[in-house]
């Protein structure tokens, strides 16, 4: 720990020296030394597994409130919706053996200056972006420059930092077609593994950071196809069709998506970050049978189930990132944002009944996350990953 802070201090010292040194002839040597220090810090961070740890109480609370951040959606604004307890927002993630620094918007903007970042996924990916927007708004307010008719895909621009932030809606990452019977939608989907969802695939060449997530839409009947041929289904139990587990079907999808990105010839220097599964915490029923999540404190590590389907899904996501890394093509990098263990411990962080459910009375939200709340730690993780890669970008071209 002392060595970590010593290295950080040296970095700031030499950054100042480089900027204000009166001897331009020494600039090259100073930059080389600064680069070495940055790499030293990177190695220091890499010795620590940020995603293995526990939650510790932090009475400072969140870096924003539902008053200071005006962009919190009503469905995640648990305090505005009447949630009486505030303790769930007063915890921080503590990795084993090191510290996870709080999110710093200034550092974030320096890393992403002139870049485009896209969060590609479902409504939980949107939840992640909403947390990031609140954290960034203390430094710079964005301009909303695009919104589709359903407000699912959006783009914001931060002019001072020349940074573009996008959230791109997709259910499965690959092309999906909902089955229609007698003119009515069924909630059953055909997934085509050899075709990407164009909502994000068409935008990929303009993206520098792609934050992917997937899984929640797999918990239903879905049919998988490859080159027009059915290769299996989830929850169908039909004769003549191969039955697939959720995790194995998801692994097929993640594999083809990562391969697609790796083979993208028009893409920039792209860092792809796969965010692992964000678990739901319905107790005493499912989402449509009265299930709820009314805890007010985190769980300990010994209280979570690492043999659960949630963990299996997380494991195949990590496995696929490990598979693609050794074969990553030039200008492609792959990382994992491993939030599953941390979030398995946070059944207290969901809106539950405090989500303003005017149209769905009696249904609780134990999938998304209150804001502020434990989801803010995802951005602590994210900036740590970005910082690691920024330190190696001197030679990444």
Swiss-Prot record:
This is Xyloglucan O-acetyltransferase 3. One of its GO terms (cellular component) is Golgi apparatus. Glycans are attached at residues 66, 162, 182, 294. Keywords: Disulfide bond, Glycoprotein, Golgi apparatus, Membrane, Signal-anchor, Transferase, Transmembrane, Transmembrane helix. GO terms for molecular function: O-acetyltransferase activity; xylan O-acetyltransferase activity. The keyword ATP-binding does not apply. PANTHER family: PROTEIN TRICHOME BIREFRINGENCE-LIKE 9-RELATED, XYLOGLUCAN O-ACETYLTRANSFERASE 3. Its main location: Golgi. The chain crosses the membrane at residues 4-24. It comes from the Eukaryota. Residues 25-397 are lumenal. The active site is at 123 (nucleophile), 365 (proton donor), 368 (proton acceptor). It is found in: Golgi apparatus membrane. The keyword Membrane applies. Xyloglucan acetyltransferase that catalyzes the acetylation of fucosylated Gal residues on xyloglucan side chains. Predominantly catalyze 6-O-monoacetylation of Gal residues in the Fuc-Gal-Xyl trisaccharide side chains of xyloglucan oligomers. InterPro entries: TBL, TBL_C, TBL_N. One of its GO terms (biological process) is xylan acetylation. Residues 1-3 are cytoplasmic. Its EC number is 2.3.1.-. Disulfide bonds join 48-98, 69-134, 78-370, 293-366. Belongs to the PC-esterase family. TBL subfamily. A motif (DXXH motif) lies at residues 365-368. A motif (GDS motif) lies at residues 121-123. It is a single-pass type II membrane protein. It comes from Populus trichocarpa.
